[in-house]
């Protein structure tokens, strides 16, 4: 560094922020790599803090809306090649407390992630700022008031598919060996 002297060494949040009060809410972590044969190799970051353990693999995110209300019921994170059949009831579970299960029925599923680039080419037309604002308002309106309130809000459900959860658990087990 052009003559600069190093007088300190630290790792991650311990170097940049106070460990007890980290300021970075979202940091990109490697989720998977593709080998020369096109095989996807899922990766995970393990942490003592359960909330910092990453979700491995290439993923899709679905939002479930009640057909009768139009309100958002839950989000489901799946493997990139999984599909959701919204003509059938579906049991989802809390990945942190797997005994907490919920059967979702009479719902419409919508993929939330859209490709921006494919094979190095931009395939997405950016919306205007007013279009982004209108979309955000519309999406917030799909949330139940109980989720949006500031006092004792209901938790909005974001679950993992069984396949994705199984991969995460296997990677956690293998990291202990």
Question: For the regions a protein language model found, what residue spans apply to each?
Answer:
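Gly/Ser/Thr/Ala-enriched C-terminal appendages of enzymes
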Residues: 1-177
């Amino acid at each position: 560094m052009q003559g600069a002297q190093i007088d300190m060494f630290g790792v991650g949040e311990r170097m940049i922020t106070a460990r007890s009060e980290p300021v970075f809410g979202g940091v990109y972590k490697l989720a998977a790599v593709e080998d020369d044969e096109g095989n996807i190799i899922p990766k995970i970051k393990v942490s003592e803090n359960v909330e910092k353990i990453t979700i491995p693999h290439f993923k899709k995110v679905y939002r479930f809306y009640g057909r009768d209300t139009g309100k958002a019921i839950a989000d489901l994170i799946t493997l990139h090649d999984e599909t959701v059949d919204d003509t059938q009831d579906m049991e989802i579970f809390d990945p942190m407390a797997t005994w907490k299960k919920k059967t979702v029925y009479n719902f419409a599923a919508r993929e939330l992630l859209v490709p921006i680039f494919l094979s190095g080419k931009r395939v997405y037309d950016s919306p205007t700022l007013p279009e982004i604002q209108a979309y955000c308002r519309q999406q917030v309106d799909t949330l139940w008031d109980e989720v949006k309130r500031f006092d004792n809000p209901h938790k909005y459900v974001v679950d993992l598919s069984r396949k994705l959860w199984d991969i995460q658990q296997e990677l956690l087990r293998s990291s202990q060996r």
